Amino acid sequence: MRVIVKIGTSSLTSDSGEVNMSALSKLVSEVVAARTQEHEIVVVTSGAITAGVQKLGIPRPDEPEILQALSAVGQIDLMRAYGEEFGSHGVATGQVLLAPHDFRDRNQYLHAETTFKHLLRLDVVPI
C-alpha cells in the first residue's frame, strides 16, 4: 500500500522556528516503522519558509516572492535534517519539488509520476 505522510510546520519546528530534531527523529522513526510493514511511503513536508526565516533571523514577511526566497534558504537545512535522520536508519531520501504546472500539464504530470515510481522502486523515500 502506498501511504502519503504530510508533516506540517508546527510538527517540525520549535517555537523559535528551528527544526525540532527530537520531533523530526520521532516522525522519521514512525515512517521507517511503516516501511517495514511493506508500505511505500511518500513524505510531503512543510517547514522550509519557517526554517529560512529562522536561519536569516528576520521577521516573516508577507510578500510571496520573499517567502519563496526564504523557502529556498530553509529547504537546504530541512532536507539535510531529513537526510540525516532517515540515514541513521539506513534509509535514503530523494527531494521532489512540484509546482502547480506539474499537475496541470499532462507531460509534466507523467514525468513526476515516473520519478516517484523509480524512487520507490529504488527503496528511496521521496520527500
Model-derived features with residue positions:
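Nucleotide/pyrophosphate-binding catalytic subdomain
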Residues: 1-127
